[in-house]
Regions:
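Generic non-transmembrane alpha-helical segments
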Residues: 119, 123-127, 155-166
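Conserved PLP-binding active-site segment of the aspartate aminotransferase-like
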Residues: 98, 142-149, 165-187
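Conserved PLP-binding catalytic core of the aspartate aminotransferase-like
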Residues: 130-160
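An acidic- and aromatic-residue-enriched active-site/binding cleft used to recognize and process polar
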Residues: 6-8, 35, 52, 173
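Short amphipathic alpha-helical segments
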Residues: 92, 137-139, 177-179
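Catalytic PLP-binding core of fold-type I/II PLP enzymes
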Residues: 1-14
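Active-site C-terminal subdomain of aminotransferase-like
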Residues: 13, 22-128
Length: 187
């Protein structure tokens, strides 16, 4: 079983929301997108895999087809068990960010972002011009204009994004066009 914990993995840092990922430690593998909440470049992520699945990971991602890399089973090197091989060191920005903020710093960021999402969700539910497309559970709020054509929703996304203070993305959820606000800001 694989768990895609792109956003959800960070719920572990929030005592109030850690229950949302209960049982993830039983998964065979887990991915977490560092760029979602660690304030690092877009392509930074982690993939955690159980040790007993290392042969499968090696077979899937081994870069040993080049003779000069040798046999990954005989001479284990993390270089040979990831898809990137010789590309840039994406872990360094994540390490610096983790070192700078620490667990308590990220707990504050995650908790604040979740609270902000719940505040927005609450405000939107009370306004008859808006409708939530899904219950707010973490840091993402999916909503739409009540009885609005997709063109109006797209125009609202553009108008809000043109302000330059935040970025909302258009989305479609359960066949309905809407907006998506994902709170991940460290400020």
């Amino acid at each position: 079983v694989h768990v895609d914990a792109a956003f959800g993995g960070f719920a572990a840092l929030s005592p109030e929301h850690a229950h949302l990922i209960a049982g993830w430690e039983m998964a065979d593998s887990v991915t977490v997108d560092n760029h979602k909440w660690l304030n690092v470049p877009y392509d930074s992520a982690c993939w955690f895999i159980r040790e007993e699945h290392l042969p499968l990971q090696s077979a899937t991602f081994q870069n040993s087809s080049a003779p000069y890399l040798g046999d990954p089973a005989a001479d284990f090197n993390y270089l040979n068990v990831g898809p990137e091989n010789s590309r840039r060191l994406r872990a360094l920005p994540a390490w610096f960010s983790l070192h700078a903020y620490g667990r308590s710093g990220y707990e504050d960021i995650v908790t604040r972002c979740i609270k902000t999402a719940f505040l927005l969700g609450s405000a939107l539910s009370e306004d008859p011009a808006f409708e939530l497309l899904a219950e707010v559970k973490l840091n993402v709020v999916a909503f739409t204009l009540t009885d609005a054509a997709p063109e109006r929703i797209n125009a609202l996304v553009q108008r809000l994004n043109d302000r330059g203070r935040y970025f909302l993305s258009p989305t479609t959820l359960f066949g309905r066009r809407g907006l998506r606000a994902a709170f991940v800001n460290w400020q």
